[in-house]
Each structure stands twice: as C-alpha cells, then as structure tokens.
From Swiss-Prot:
Keywords: Coiled coil, Endoplasmic reticulum, ER-Golgi transport, Membrane, Protein transport, Transmembrane, Transmembrane helix, Transport
GO molecular function, one term: SNAP receptor activity
Family of the protein in this entry: Belongs to the syntaxin family.
Descriptive protein name: Syntaxin-18
Gene Ontology biological-process entries: intracellular protein transport; retrograde vesicle-mediated transport, Golgi to endoplasmic reticulum
Cytoplasmic side: 1-288
C-alpha cells in the first residue's frame, strides 16, 4: 500500500506560494471573492503576521506528516519486527527528498521575512516583536529538522543492522541442517534388535578429534558473532554521531543564511552611502567652480572700474 503524501504536497505548495509572495512575484488578480475585497487594508497592514502564520502552519503540517508515517518509515530493513511495512524504499527516498526541499524552502521563507522586516520603516517595538517571532519560528523549524534527522538515523541504523545480520543467515541454515541431521541420527529404532541399536549407537559416537573440531568451529562462530556485535555497536555509534553532526550542520547552514542576509543588507547600505558621497563630491566641485567664476568676474569688474576712474580723472 502506497503512503499518502498529499499533506506534504499541499504544505510544499503553500510554502512556495509564501516564498513567492515574499519575493513579490505574485500579484493580486481580479478573480478574488467579493468578501476578500472588503478588507484589503488589514491584509496589507498585517502581511507579516499572515506570512508568519502560513510558515508556521506549513512546518506543523510537515511535523504531523513525519509523525504520522514514522512507524512505516523507520521499519525499513527491520529484521526484528514481525510487522510488514507498507512503505517501499523508493517512497522513503521520496519522503527524504521532499522533506529536505520543504525544510529548505521554509528556511528561505524565514530569511525573506527577515529581509523584509529590515527594509520596512516601523517602530523599534514592532521590529523587536517581529524579530522574536522569527526566532521562535526558526527554533520550531530546527526542532522539526531534528525530528527528521532522528528518524532518518534510525532508518539507516536498521538498514545497516539488516545487512550485517543477513551475513549470518547461510551459517544459521547450515547449523540448523546439521542439528536436524544429528537429531535424525540420534533417534533410536523402536522395533529393531537391541544389539543392532547398541552397535549403531557406538558408531554414532563422536571421536575426540571430531569433538575438538566442533569445539573449534563453535569458538570460531562465537568469535565471529562477537566481532559482528562489536561492529554493529560501532556502526550504531557512528550513525548517532552522523545524526548529531547533521543537526549541527543544519543549524550552521541556517545561521550562515542569516549572516549572508545581514551582510547583503550591509553591502546594499554601503553602496547607497557611496552613491550619496559621490553626489556630494560632484555638488561640491560644481559649487567651487561657480565660486571661482564669481571671484574672477569681481576682479575683472574692479579692474575695469579702476581703468575708467583713471581715464575720467585724466
């Protein structure tokens, strides 16, 4: 039975719409309902809250989807569970791909909301409130990412355990076969002669060399089992370490996205300041040139005045 990922698909579509709205790629069309046109001002005024609620709703849908399909998802390759998983490996891989894209899209939507918050001219109290809201949403997304990482780590661990334990199946089959052969050989003949049964029993007794050989084989099997158990424990520790590193990596990626956005804002501000400085320099050069022209004009007029007075006196 195929897993139902309709909720994840709808949540992904809503997240993409939210990101497009934040980027300004979607415009309101004239096909809106009459009831929606009566309140355009509150929507325009409270667009941040609407987008934040939509992002939270999408993250909650992802969390519900992961918890709903957790049992079928983590049963991949489980050899200890007696239940049959209703989810195939391809469906699990598709869930991994969609969940990663979904979480990346949510992180981009949060980053876009942060950039919009920095661009808008609002009071300091409103800006602090929106920053706190975005921090809470970011923490919520990190919690869902941690939940997904833990589920994926459990799935990988069970797949590795199955591959390790599958190597013991041929040896177990041979051991069971030898045990069944031994039981058949040890069954006494109920209707035979007592002397013949005694002779067969003596022939079935193992020699010391055979007993020593079986003991060595048993010791070898025990050693292999212990080594496999140690390898499984090491792999389990490595899987847990990989899960922890993946969680740290996701947190660092989100922090780097926030830092990149802040650096982008600083670069944009520095560019604007450089443009304003160039304009001021041009204006100063223009004013300085005009001042020189007026001084030259004043000197020329003074010279002509002195020449006129000298001519007039003579």
């Amino acid at each position: 039975m195929a897993a139902d990922i309709t909720l994840l698909f709808k949540a992904s579509v809503k997240t993409v719409k939210t990101r497009n709205k934040a980027l300004g790629l979607m415009e309101t069309t004239g096909r809106e309902e009459p009831g929606a046109q009566k309140r355009p001002r509150p929507r325009q005024r409270d667009s941040f809250s609407c987008k934040a609620r939509e992002v939270i709703s999408n993250i909650s849908k992802l969390k519900d989807f992961l918890l709903q399909h957790r049992k079928d998802y983590v049963n991949a390759g489980s050899v200890m569970s007696s239940e049959v998983s209703r989810m195939t490996d391809s469906e699990r891989d598709q869930i991994d791909q969609d969940a990663q894209i979904f979480m990346r899209t949510c992180a981009e939507a949060i980053s876009q909301l942060r950039s919009e918050m920095d661009k808008k001219q609002v009071s300091m109290q409103v800006k602090d409130h929106r920053a706190a809201v975005l921090d809470l949403i970011d923490s919520y997304l990190k919690g869902v990412c941690k939940l997904y990482s833990e589920q994926r780590a459990v799935r990988v661990k069970r797949v590795v355990d199955k591959k390790r334990l599958s190597r013991l199946e041929p040896e177990q089959i041979n051991t069971e076969k030898r045990q069944s052969d031994g039981e058949e050989n040890d069954k006494p003949v109920s209707d035979g002669n007592v002397d013949l049964w005694e002779e067969n029993r003596v022939e079935d007794d193992l020699s010391p060399e055979e007993i020593q050989m079986f003991e060595q084989e048993n010791q070898r099997l025990v050693g292999e089992m212990n080594s496999l158990l140690d390898e499984v424990r090491q792999i389990e520790g490595k899987v847990v370490e990989i899960s922890r590193l993946q969680e740290i990596f996701s947190e660092k990626v989100l922090q780097q996205e926030t830092e990149i956005d802040s650096i982008h804002q600083l670069v944009v501000g520095a560019t604007e300041n450089v443009k304003e400085g160039n304009e001021d320099i041009r204006e100063a050069i223009k004013n300085n040139a005009g001042f020189r022209v007026w001084i030259l004009f004043f000197l020329v007029m003074c010279s002509f005045s002195l020449l006129f007075l000298d001519w007039y006196d003579s």
